[in-house]
């Protein structure tokens, strides 16, 4: 981490006689790339992978048969297990049909179920956009005082199921707000007396609820936990391990391609100052959509995310006001000839951005989708304008009002760029109407961006204040409301909770686009919760983030 002595403010170039004084620039002293050429050296046994694919096909048919022959609570549990194991994406059609049938019988079944099954049904339906009523939980409350019954506190599995279900709620689900408080308090109190396997599972959930976790990381964790359970299904376990490792092999190949691209353009070598984080940039699109059919989308989105990260560092740390004005202007022109007006050290970045998008536009044109590139261009123009506005705030010493700051953050957080990049590279799920919708910044996108910025700022504001940075949302809130840091953090964390409820509400059917689209965008919120869970896991990528990426991209599961 950079210390205060590493950081110095901008000074404008001064002319004394005929010699200009050297410009003094800020530096964040970012640590180097922790992956090096690992993926370039990685080799795979294709014969072994093909054998794994054949075995996985056989097991998939067995899972399909099992899914079609069971009913009721047993089917609910199987669907939930498939999600935890990370293989539900292989059975989307069958699960959708099953949940539609379950939704139609929701009210009738709710009168008969125990808390564990009822909460599981509610959560699965809400996760898939079905507006299951939370009123079904009223039967677990006392009629006199409205509190949850004492018997609920002694039902650990029921409480755990209710706890997880509570996070798919909206602002209208007041009972779920009470449930979060009730279950968190009672599960925490009961934790020391639980058997080890259950205690580990409960502690994992209390650390971060399932609804905020990423499927691939959750699958890696759950496969290990599932194997420890003596009641596990050996066929399901083997299938989950094979599927995880096969996907990991695909993701490794994508990272090999990305590392080749990144090494070839060598922007860090040419520019020296930015964060070298191409593997960490891959974390965002991998979190958004990990399935095989989205391979191209992940590759393109990672390239754009890494280039945007360098642009962010240029505006945040390194560039002078005059240089940033020039760069903002040439980005708006989007013309390779315009690079002549840029300082030499910025030219490689401009060239790489325009060339990367041009190459992709040519690829898209072969399938009649060249129009997508114009949306990507506009997203880049928009974010550079937002970055420049915030750089002006910093240089003027301005602390904006909270909503003014968050309005800018709807663009500068980077999620409109990342989402546009994901869908620009995606397959048939992308339409012109979808890209127009994202560009128009509907409330769903604004909420996702709001959550992104607040979560980011809560975890990074102290370091950025030391480095020299535009005022964070924490500083803006303290200034506007004349409160202390703890009060500001309490209110902002409450804002995050409420924004999650709005995001959940937006994913209720009918939705403006298919659930697969809505979930890709919602997954970007989950990436923030994970990547910034213990601090800035992107800038400081050599600890927890490295461990998580090892699980995702390096270490296969023993089969």
UniProtKB/Swiss-Prot annotation:
InterPro entries associated with the record: Isoprenoid_synthase_dom_sf, Terpene_cyclase-like_1_C, Terpene_cyclase_plant_C1, Terpene_synth_N, Terpene_synth_N_sf, Terpene_synthase-like, Terpene_synthase_metal-bd, Terpenoid_cyclase/PrenylTrfase
The record's note on its domains: The Asp-Asp-Xaa-Xaa-Asp/Glu (DDXXD/E) motif is important for the catalytic activity, presumably through binding to Mg(2+).
Pathway recorded for this protein: Secondary metabolite biosynthesis; terpenoid biosynthesis
Designated name of the protein: Terpene synthase 1
Any coiled-coil regions, as ranges: none
Cofactors, names only: Mg(2+); Mn(2+)
GO biological process terms on file: beta-caryophyllene biosynthetic process; diterpenoid biosynthetic process; green leaf volatile biosynthetic process; sesquiterpene biosynthetic process
Catalytic activity: (2E,6E)-farnesyl diphosphate = (-)-(E)-beta-caryophyllene + diphosphate; (2E,6E)-farnesyl diphosphate = alpha-humulene + diphosphate
CDD domains: Terpene_cyclase_plant_C1
Top-level taxon of origin: Eukaryota
Purpose of the protein: Sesquiterpene synthase involved in the biosynthesis of volatile compounds that contribute to the characteristic flavors of black pepper. Mediates the conversion of (2E,6E)-farnesyl diphosphate (FPP) into beta-caryophyllene and, as a minor compound, into alpha-humulene.
Family affiliation: Belongs to the terpene synthase family. Tpsa subfamily.
Cofactor detail note: Binds 3 Mg(2+) or Mn(2+) ions per subunit.
Keyword Lyase: yes
């Amino acid at each position: 981490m950079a210390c205060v002595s590493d950081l110095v403010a901008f000074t404008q170039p001064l002319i004394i006689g005929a010699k200009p004084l050297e410009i003094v620039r800020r530096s964040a002293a970012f640590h180097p790339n922790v992956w090096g050429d690992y993926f370039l050296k990685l080799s795979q046994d294709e014969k072994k992978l093909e054998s794994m694919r054949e075995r996985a096909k056989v097991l998939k048919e067995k899972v399909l048969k099992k899914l079609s022959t069971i009913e009721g609570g047993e089917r609910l549990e199987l669907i939930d297990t498939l999600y935890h194991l990370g293989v539900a994406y292989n059975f989307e059609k069958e699960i959708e049909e099953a949940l539609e049938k379950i939704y139609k019988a929701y009210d009738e079944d709710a009168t008969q179920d125990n808390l564990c099954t009822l909460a599981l049904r509610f959560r699965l339906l809400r996760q898939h956009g079905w507006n299951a009523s939370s009123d079904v939980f009223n039967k677990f409350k006392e009629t006199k005082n409205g509190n949850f019954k004492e018997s609920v506190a002694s039902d650990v599995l029921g409480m755990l199921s209710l706890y997880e279900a509570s996070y798919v709620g909206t602002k209208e689900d007041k009972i779920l707000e009470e449930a979060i408080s009730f279950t968190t308090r009672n599960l925490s109190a009961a934790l020391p007396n639980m058997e080890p396997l259950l205690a580990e599972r409960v502690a994992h959930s209390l650390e971060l609820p399932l609804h905020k976790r990423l499927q691939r990381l959750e699958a890696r964790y759950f496969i290990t936990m599932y194997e420890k359970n003596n009641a596990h299904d050996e066929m399901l376990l083997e299938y989950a391990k094979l599927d995880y490792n096969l996907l990991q092999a695909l993701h490794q190949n994508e990272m090999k391609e990305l590392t080749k691209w990144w090494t070839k353009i060598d922007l860090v070598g040419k520019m020296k100052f930015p964060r070298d984080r191409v593997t960490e940039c891959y974390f965002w699109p991998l979190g958004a959509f990990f399935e095989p059919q989205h391979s191209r989308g992940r590759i393109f989105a990672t390239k754009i995310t890494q280039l945007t990260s360098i642009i962010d560092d240029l505006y945040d740390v390194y560039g002078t006001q005059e240089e940033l004005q020039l760069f903002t202007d040439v980005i708006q022109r989007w013309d390779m000839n315009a690079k002549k007006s840029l300082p030499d050290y910025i030219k490689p970045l401009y060239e790489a951005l325009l060339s990367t998008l041009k190459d992709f536009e040519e690829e898209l044109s072969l399938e009649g989708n060249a129009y997508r590139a114009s949306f990507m261009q506009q997203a880049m123009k928009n974010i550079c304008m937002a970055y420049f506005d915030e750089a002006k705030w910093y240089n003027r010493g301005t602390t904006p009002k909270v909503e003014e700051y968050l309005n800018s953050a709807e663009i500068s957080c980077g999620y409109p760029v990342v989402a546009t990049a994901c869908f620009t590279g995606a397959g048939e799920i992308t339409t012109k109407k979808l890209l127009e919708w994202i560009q128009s910044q509907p409330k769903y996108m604004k909420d996702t961006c709001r959550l992104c910025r607040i979560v980011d700022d809560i975890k990074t504001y102290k370091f950025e204040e030391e480095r020299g940075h535009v005022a964070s949302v924490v500083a803006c809130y303290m200034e506007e409301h004349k409160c202390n840091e703890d009060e500001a953090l309490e209110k902002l964390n409450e804002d995050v909770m409420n924004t999650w409820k709005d995001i959940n509400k937006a994913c209720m059917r009918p939705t403006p686009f298919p659930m697969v689209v809505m979930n890709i965008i919602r997954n970007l919120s989950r990436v923030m919760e994970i990547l910034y869970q213990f601090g800035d896991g992107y800038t400081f990528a050599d600890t927890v983030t490295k461990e998580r990426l090892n699980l995702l991209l390096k270490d296969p599961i023993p089969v």
